[in-house]
Regions:
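Outer-membrane beta-barrel proteins and related beta-barrel translocases across Gram-negative bacteria
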Residues: 1-167
Length: 167
């Protein structure tokens, strides 16, 4: 594998595995951070799995993957705009079949969840808040995927139309 730090804002890890039966795996991981602005982490994993001997009964070949991304914005960056993401999606059998993910908590976890949201506050009188949120839920046992496409929400500060502005 390789570890690179191309700048002070992010790093990159490239890892690969090769097994004698022809199976292989690749992992790309990166962390990024800009002080007082944002930070996050991205992980992409892919494996090509071969089981058995080619030409014999029981031979199988499969591809599995997992993508994780987290991003958060520092509240000091822009107090009126906010973006955050927590993404975890992949093959339904990734944690059961992966050669590099043999740990009980991940193996027993049956759901992969994701959420991405953006909100904005418009200053003024009255102030207006709007937000968009999208989410994803994946059950690895039943192999069902539920997507909630962007949901819009808007709020307006309470207005008192018959109250004098001065006094």
């Amino acid at each position: 594998g390789y570890y690179l730090a191309p700048s002070e804002y992010f790093d990159l890890t490239l890892l690969g595995d090769y097994y004698t039966n022809g199976s292989y795996g690749m992992r790309v991981e990166s962390s990024y951070r800009k002080r007082y602005s944002f930070n996050g982490r991205l992980s992409v994993r892919f494996e090509n799995l071969i089981d058995g001997e080619r030409g014999l009964p029981g031979y199988s070949k499969s591809n599995i993957y997992n993508i994780r991304w987290t991003h958060s914005q520092d509240s000091k960056a822009n107090p009126y705009n906010r973006f955050s993401a927590s993404v975890n999606l992949g093959s339904s059998n990734y944690f059961r079949e992966s050669l590099n993910q043999i740990n009980t908590p991940n193996f027993l976890n049956n759901t992969l969840n994701s959420s991405v949201s953006f909100s904005k506050t418009f200053r003024g009188s009255p102030s207006v808040n709007v937000s968009l949120t999208a989410s994803h839920s994946q059950n690895t046992r039943s192999k069902t995927v539920n997507l909630v496409l962007p949901t819009f929400q808007g709020n307006v500060e309470r207005v008192y139309p018959f109250v004098k502005k001065n006094g």
